[in-house]
């Protein structure tokens, strides 16, 4: 049985994170190696979007949770690559002038700034197609597993989830309530966290009730991280975060609706619920270790850039 990483042993935990991040990064790079079969500017736009660093949290969650559930890493890798690739594609669209009109992403020019809007849009579409292809062609998985993973990913990016949430973000109700915002976060941000939790659970063939609870944990983790993102947009430093801040100016978020302190409390409550669900369904393990470290790092970024304590998640 896996022994949880001692969070006080920073070097050991960083080594584990670096290994996962490196494995995912290598596999993503391999997926982007088309040679001369793809127009060079399009391939460059795709690579710019998906290979420019990033924390790889969603992909690492696939590997961590899959490890806890006893799924071999080789069977998890295509899901991790696909989710990271879809996430990058969604950011390309999110940054477009007709959306958030962001100029920087992952400490470099946004894809539409570097390559133009047309190439950025085509890069996003191509990344999504490539993500599905990576899973559909994974011979480490059974045909049934490939089908269930593709179904999960298709739903995650579709009109009932990520795309619907992005629409809600662009055209919110005039008087948005807290529940309106939570619903938006569940669709837009939670979608890929749910997928990151569902994919390894599906591969582990957990029972339907456990699958539901694991997916619910992913949904709540997505809500927590969107709240942290709102707080960083409100109080953060662009250099420390690696992307534009102030993009939510004039938009109602939980950070502006509730205030930073109450929003941070809500995020902490969501994280506590995530940890409870995982302890009861999966048990102590690498996924919980990773989630705690993710929350601590995001909170640390917020405190460093804002010089305040109200971004600290106090979930146990």
What are these regions (language model features)?
Residues 290, 294-307, 311-312, 316:
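C-terminal domain/tail detector
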Residues 32, 36-281, 285-299:
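Mg2+-dependent prenyl diphosphate-binding active-site environment of isoprenoid biosynthetic enzymes
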Residues 3, 7-10, 137-139, 208, ...:
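Short linear motifs in intrinsically disordered/low-complexity regions
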Residues 1-32:
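N-terminal amphipathic/basic leader segments beginning at the initiator methionine
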